[in-house]
Structure formats: structure tokens, C-alpha cells
Amino acid sequence: MVIFGLTGGIGSGKSLVASYFSTFFKAKIFDADKVVHELYKYDSDVIRLVSEYFPDSVDNGIVDRNNLRQHFLTDNHLWVEFQSVIHAIVLKKKKDFIMLHNRRSVRYVVLDIPLLIESNFYSCCDFIIHVTTSRLLQMQRVLRRGLSIKEFESIRCKQLSESSRKKFANFTIRTGLSKKDILFQIKKIMLNVNNKCNMD
């Protein structure tokens, strides 16, 4: 099994790259955002945890993610404590995901985790791919999700710089180009990786 980790700022195109790995190389994708979304929606222990830390973010047992995001943006000590618990749960689910697909002899696994580097989720990766694009395109993508420019800038400031990400990366994919070009970049990486794996 080869494990890829995707690192990139908000709106850089990580999910787009992950979808290409899934479609063209049958990779299994661990989508941390989806995992957390499901925890907030269905996990009673997590919903209870949210209500303990941020009572105004839960109404009748339903987590208001927009409200919860505002607590993240304030960057207070409560959020740091809360986030550490959520990260521990996600880490366990990531390990279970990898073990499951290893038993099934899956060839490729891709970790699509926003804080891959910052939260040390990358230690199990064989290769790290830095996904990048222009700041303008990042902002356009984020605004389409319903976030404001202020929220985009605030989140972006809390994330690692592009230069810091590059230090961890084995490869870089630029997503501000055509879909055909993005696929070409991925195919080039896969050729490189498969050649390396065959040599080892």
C-alpha cells in the first residue's frame, strides 16, 4: 500500500486532486472534513462535547457548524482544547481506515486532511503532495462555499505558509490550470512513485 498525504491551504483544490486519484487510480480517500461533518451530525458523544464547550452552537441536539466556525475564528483556549479531542477521534478513524484498506490489499490511499502537517497526521504517509493555486482562485472557491472574505483571510492566516508546506512535500500539484493539466501532473507523480516502489 502507498499512502499519499495532501497538504494545501483552504481552497487550494485538495478535494479535487483527491477525486482524480479516486477516479483514475482507484485510490481510497480519507476525507477528514467529511468525517468531522458526520461526527457533528451523528455522534452523540461529539454533539455532547460541542454543547459542553460551546452551548450556543447546539440547538435541540443539532450542531450549528456556522456558529461553531466563529469560535474557531476567535482562536481562544477553549477551541484549542476542543480541537485536540476532535483530532484524537479523527486520528483513530484514520488509523482504522488505513488498516481496513490494507487488509483489503488496496494499492493507494489518499489522506485529504486540512491540517495534515499542523496536527502531525502526516507521519504515516509515504509521499506528501503540496496542492497549491493562486490566492485569488483560493478565495473564489471559498466564497462559493458561503464563507466571507474576512473568514477566508482569517482561516488562511491560521494555516501554514506555502513555503512551510513545500519543506514537507515530495511533489507539488498546481490546480489553477485545466482539468487535463491537473490529471497530467498526477499521472507524472504516479509514474515517479511506481518506479520508485519497483526499485525498492
From Swiss-Prot:
The keyword Nucleotide-binding applies. Its EC number is 2.7.1.24. GO terms for molecular function: ATP binding; dephospho-CoA kinase activity. ATP binds at residues 11-16. One of its GO terms (cellular component) is cytoplasm. Pfam families: CoaE. Its main location: cytoplasm. It comes from the Bacteria. It catalyses: 3'-dephospho-CoA + ATP = ADP + CoA + H(+). Transmembrane segments: none annotated. Residues 3-200 form the DPCK domain. Pathway: Cofactor biosynthesis; coenzyme A biosynthesis; CoA from (R)-pantothenate: step 5/5. The keyword Nucleotide-binding applies. One of its GO terms (biological process) is coenzyme A biosynthetic process. It is found in: Cytoplasm. Keywords: ATP-binding, Coenzyme A biosynthesis, Cytoplasm, Kinase, Nucleotide-binding, Transferase. CDD domains: DPCK. Catalyzes the phosphorylation of the 3'-hydroxyl group of dephosphocoenzyme A to form coenzyme A. Belongs to the CoaE family. This is Dephospho-CoA kinase.
